[in-house]
Structure formats: structure tokens, C-alpha cells
């Protein structure tokens, strides 16, 4: 995977390696949801935008033939344990799974964060 930036937008480029790649799947985690609104501003609510982004990513990855699941596909509340449970229910404790958690941070963030669990 390659991460690049242009005009304060992060681009994630995934390289598909054919049979040599042992990737079991990708799990897309739409940050917040339900009673947890996340950040908001200019009429945009984080939980709605992260779900929209995750649905777009889901469609694109599915079109590429990559096994993909979402922690939520509607406006529901999930605590962190629920999110982990979704991954484990689908893929077990495999290290061959990529989990992408989408968030739109407010406040003092510089607009680009990459973290790991």
C-alpha cells in the first residue's frame, strides 16, 4: 500500500499481488454511528460522512475482487468491542486482514493521521 497526499487529501493506493498475496480481506470501520455523532461542522456530521466514505470504499474494493466487510452499514451505535467482534466473526484472529477505520477529526488535528491497532 502506498499513501500519498495532494492538496490536503490522502490517497491510499493498494497493490494487488495475485496469488502471492495472502490477504484474507479488508474490514471497513465507519467511525462513530448511532448515538455517537462524532465531530460536526458546517452541517456535516462525522458519523454520516464516515459511513458514506466506507460504503464508497466497499463498492470499489468489491469491484476489484477484494473480500471486504463493514463493521456497520447503517446508523447504529457500536462500541469498540463490537467493532473487534465484527472483524473476528468474519476473519478470526488472522493477521492477514486489513482494518481501515474512517474518521474525520476536528480540533487541532492537521488533517492527516495514520494509526494502527
PLM-predicted stretches and their roles:
Residues 17-117:
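Catalytic-core regions of hydrolytic enzymes
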Amino acid at each position: 500500500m502506498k499513501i500519498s497526499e495532494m492538496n490536503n487529501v490522502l490517497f491510499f493506493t493498494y497493490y494487488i499481488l495475485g496469488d502471492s498475496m495472502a490477504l484474507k480481506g479488508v474490514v471497513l470501520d465507519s467511525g462513530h454511528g448511532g448515538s455517537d455523532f462524532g465531530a460536526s461542522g458546517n452541517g456535516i456530521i462525522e458519523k454520516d460522512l464516515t459511513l458514506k466514505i466506507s460504503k464508497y470504499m466497499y463498492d470499489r474494493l468489491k469491484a476489484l475482487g477484494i473480500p471486504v466487510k463493514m463493521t456497520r452499514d447503517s446508523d447504529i451505535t457500536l462500541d469498540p468491542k463490537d467493532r473487534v467482534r465484527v472483524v473476528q466473526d468474519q476473519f478470526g484472529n488472522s493477521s492477514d486482514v486489513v482494518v481501515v477505520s474512517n474518521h474525520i477529526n476536528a480540533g487541532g488535528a492537521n488533517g492527516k493521521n495514520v494509526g494502527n491497532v
